[in-house]
UniProtKB/Swiss-Prot annotation:
GO function term, MF aspect, one: nicotinate-nucleotide-dimethylbenzimidazole phosphoribosyltransferase activity
Family statement: Belongs to the UPF0284 family.
Gene3D superfamilies: 3.40.50.10210
Name of protein: UPF0284 protein PF0303
Annotated Pfam families: DBI_PRT (PF02277)
Amino acid sequence: MKSLFLLVLGNTEVSLIPGISVAGATPELTKYTPPADAEYLFYDKPKIIDAIPVTPEGHPTPAIITKAARELANFPILVVRGGTYLAPKVPHVHISSIVGRDFRREPALPEAGEIIERAKLLGQELERSGIEELVIGESTPGGTTTAQAILWALGYEGKTSSASPNNPQELKRRVIEEGFRRAGIEFGGLKGNSLEALRQFGDPMMATVVGLSLGFKGDVVLAGGTQMLAVAAILKGLGEDLSRFMIATTRWVVEDKSATFIKTAREIGIISYAADLDFSKSEFKGLRDYEKGYVKEGVGAGGATWLAVKAGFSPEDVVRKVEELYRKLIS
């Protein structure tokens, strides 16, 4: 089966709220995370900043897992700029440079319809090219908060994960409730109106992935954790049959006690795969800490591992390759 891995980049002002995102060493650095993640897949290190994206405690971006899987299985990667502050310095498809707004103050993405339409065209062209399966990953700091807002607006009681072991659920709840007050809705208030939920609370990554999924009629693997649950919920709300979709994530997301991945996936009605990666024996603390709940997923790590497994490699092979890449990074 001919598969293509897409990495969709997105930013939202929500990532600038202190304490909400650890997908960058500081809130300000989250602006650089999506392009830097994309660049690291192609170069030894990013061009846009002189280091790979890390959490404030120094844990490496999950892009290292995606890069490892790709070095093993050699699948093609296409970078898509859904809507970011900065363009990546790698070849990419430009959908928009629109960044999601802070939904506490204003609608997050009034341009959602326009982004979906453009991404849909790209999905249609990819279908014409003979590709049978899209595996779509994302890099979107703050995206678990926009995802949780969407799920709640659509009436799903889901709790999304976080790249931190201390999932800021209380802060997320306050931020979302403020957004709901601004929009004049309550929990489940936009049930049956996916597009309005996306306009009010979403981010450009979600709109791009929705458009790609509508335009491409083959199999789609939504390669992300709880953020892709929001995408699946929107697609379901738009009347899309989810039987050709699957979510591929990592076991760290599935095992996250502070989130509700399996329960919410079941409610939405989408099947899932969890990459069985294990860094507990790693010689590097930055990787061992994934087992303590740091990072968990992103940049399509679960989906990339799934492609490597389909190509005959084991999760252990991916882990070994990650170690090798990490050693290179810190030497």
